[in-house]
Amino acid sequence: VTTMESMFEAAYAFDQNIGSWDTSNVTSMEEMFSKGGSNNMSFNNGGSPDIGNWDTSSVRTMYFMFNGNTEFDQPLGSGGGVSGWDVSSVKVFESMFQGASKFNQDIGSWDVSGTQTNSDYWCAAGFRKMFDYAIAFNNGGSDSIKNWDMTGACNVEQMFHITSMNQDLSTWCVPNVTSKNSFATIYNGVHGNGNLRDRTPLSDAKTPVWGKCPSIATLVLTSDDSDNIITTSQVTLTATFSLSMSPTPT
């Protein structure tokens, strides 16, 4: 089997443990557990985390995979007794968890660098609406998502729109992002009639600097006082930089 596209789409009551499946040759999981209609999906792998052991190394698209699946919340990142999904070949994450209102797992271990900017199609899809209306999502409360390699991303429009995302993403390197409308809007509750309220954007301090890569250089001063010398009103400090530095005389 090389495609599982729309396999359980609109199978609203399906909820069995299929974590033992061999998915190593599958290239498309597009809309696999998508609601596909007005009703929401209830798939949660029978309550088992085994789905986190799937071999997804060949998958190229997870477009709309869990769209409208209001029950799914199993670990898909490494740790927690599962190996975690290998998504390094995935080029499209668009709307993967859109409307997956319970999903809140730590997927910071994912290698998402497979997205590309050399194709209009891949670029337009990319991470667009990946977690849109996934109201519980905050990467399981972990800041590990800050380690995602986003250099290939060019569309993050509504990526975290109406979520609980409050992790610091300011370290993301996003030199190619061209579409970022409503990137992250934090969800804080509903009125009695179900209308969304109290929506606030992710703070500027936690938002990536669009079109740029932040400097990751750090400076560590020695803790050995013998390395720090004061002579004739001059202070000599011994320091270590995390990156190669080219000294510039002043």
Which residues fall in each region the model found?
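Negatively charged
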Residues: 1-215
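Non-catalytic beta-sheet/beta-sandwich ligand-binding modules that flank or precede catalytic cores
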Residues: 214-250
